[in-house]
Amino acid sequence: MAQRVPTELGEKPIGILLMNYALPAIMAMVASSLYNIVDRAFIGHYVGTLALGGLTATFPFMNLGAAFGAMVGVGACTVISVRLGQKDYATAQNVLGNTITLNLILGTLFTIVCLTFLDPILQIFGASETTLPYAREYMQIVLAFNVISHSYLGLNAIMRAAGHPITAMALTLCGVMVNAALDPLFIIVLDMGIRGAAIATIISQSLALAAILLLFSRKSELLHLRRGIYKLKASIVRQTLAIGMSPFLMNSCACLVVLLLNRSMQEYGGDNALAAYGIVNSIAFVFIMIVMGLNQGMQPIAGYNWGAHQNDRVWQVLRYTMTAATAVTIIGFLTGMFIPEMPARIFTNDEQIVSMAAHGFRICVLIFPLVGGQIVVSHFFQSIGHAGKSIFLSLSRQLIFLIPGILILPKYLGLDGVWYSMPFADAMSCIIAATLLWWQVRHIRSKEESKA
């Protein structure tokens, strides 16, 4: 029996839909962030703070890899959601096959280029003479199996659009549990250090990818693997990459930003500051991933109803998502203000680094209550196919505000200036997002009134 078309996206109450789609996505995103947290916690406690600094130097690599994965995965997810809303099932099927092909091509090219120039790239990304060996060991493993990571992230996103949010969540959770079980084995028992953490991550992602491919190989699925869908089609590739360009540019800019942050931390605070930034990044990442999970829950709902011209439901899911995201970032703000040392100790017992991380976290969350809404607005435009606005919002925080902040503020405030550049950029980008959303709502409602 063929899988039921997910028409519930246009029929069920928005609150129930968002809960059904967002909760699994949130758990999946938090679980995904736990891959890095588990690795860093074991590395910080059992390998040392220099290894933790080396791992921080790999952050730009992770952002760049995520950029290519998101360009294909998020773009394909949006195209599939809209096509399902339009009842265009043949195109949705072809998008699935094209996603696999694109991930194989881009993942392979990324691996070849980065492995060829690995040491110079890591030095540019902020690795010092003492942290470079650790960063190199980790990235050699991660890059060698990069195609697996790309394919896993892309197909996991498509599972949600295809009506399997709970399965997507379950596979991610299973992957994290496997990773958490393998980390002590490879890092401590087999004494493989930071290389063992990378191997554990790759094994866990490989198992999750195999399960996803098994699910999509079933002919009972509305979207399933079959001959004829893997050959790249220009129209699908164009639309997928155009919509995926927003997260690609956002992650690419994040790569540049983290590069500058790493180098500034190294310049103004040394290896300890670099390790402290890695801790702060990991803590804040959890809250951001919860917001991203809300966005992933919103995406198929907004995309389907936009394609079905049910604008009231589109605005409703946006309001619900923004409210939930703001609640999440308020919790992050309170954590950073009142108990920043507690999460920092997950990663290290070095009191100097814990103190530096707590101080930096407290500064970073100054504007956090507003950040959730800004992120939701950017992904909302992406969900309804308005790639240009989404790209602009993604770039405004990184290029227009954050990079100048990183370059200017430390000259006057030293290491604190590096930390303060982040809430400064958040405040400015929130103003831009609110303005664009106000204009979009007004524009659509005026069109609806003219048709009435």
PLM features: what roles do these ranges have?
Residues 1-22, 80-147, 189-244, 302-367, ...:
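Short alpha-helical transmembrane segments in multi-pass integral membrane proteins
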Residues 73, 141-160, 171-179, 197-210, ...:
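Short runs within selected transmembrane alpha-helices of multi-pass transporters and secretion channels
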Residues 34-53, 122-129, 185-192, 252-282, ...:
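Helix-terminus/linker motif at the lipid-water interface of multi-pass membrane proteins
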Residues 20-39, 141, 175, 204-208, ...:
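Transmembrane helical elements of multi-pass membrane transporters/channels
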Residues 11, 15-34, 38, 61-68, ...:
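Residue-level signal for short hydrophobic patches within transmembrane helices
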Residues 31, 35, 65-69, 109, ...:
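Residue-level hotspots within pore-lining transmembrane alpha-helices
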Residues 40, 49-52, 89, 118, ...:
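Membrane-helix interface/capping residues of multi-pass secondary transporters
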